[in-house]
Amino acid sequence: DSIYDGGTFSVTPFREDGYVDYIRFRDPRVISFFSIYNEMFKSYTVTHTINDIGFTGVGDTAIRVQKFENYFAYDDGTPEAGYGLSVANSKAAIQFQLNTKDTLRRIQMYFNPTLTSANEQYFYLMVWKSIEPEEVLYKKRFKVTFTEGLYNFHTFDLDTSIVLANEFYIGFLQTGSENLNVGFDYALDSREYLFYNIGVGWNPTIFSGSLMMRPLFGEVMPTGVEDLKPLK
């Protein structure tokens, strides 16, 4: 780990909004490198502090933690609503884009708890290379599962590794007409990447927000084969 000092910059008087274009803030040097080993996670803490004459120091600092992990997410981890489809055999799909080839190992979903667990239904977890035309890479039946704790996602392990590149989609096929009530985040709007199909073709969603499904990449999967013993 290392620390990068961006220095200081004087903001012109009477400036109420806008972006600071000071190069050390705008384009900081990368001086902390990833390990030569296979790291799955890395995080950086970015801190900005504003000082002024007579400033009390209260509320003068903005801190952001930038995480690099093994999953993609449009949501912020907190559901404000639930998403589902009201027609049997309907499908929903979220589009993602990879910058480099990687291996999909698992998919996480958050399901809202409901009265009498009404959404505890079976569904098909799906992965597509394309939805128009449909090119299905994975389809397997699972049951809605709740994970103990506040807003904890359930992780579905894929029984086969899927090597992906460029654009791909993850989603579900709903076997019944009961709403699965997948967590839906209103705070972050990624509606342009969410599509649904109730049997008459794919359409973009009309709802502003993000479906709480996440693809997980790159972890080593157990093979079930014992390690070979060295020859003597």
Report the location of each language-model feature.
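Intrinsically disordered, low-complexity Pro/Gly/Ser/Thr-rich segments with frequent PxxP/GP/PP motifs
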Residues: 2-39
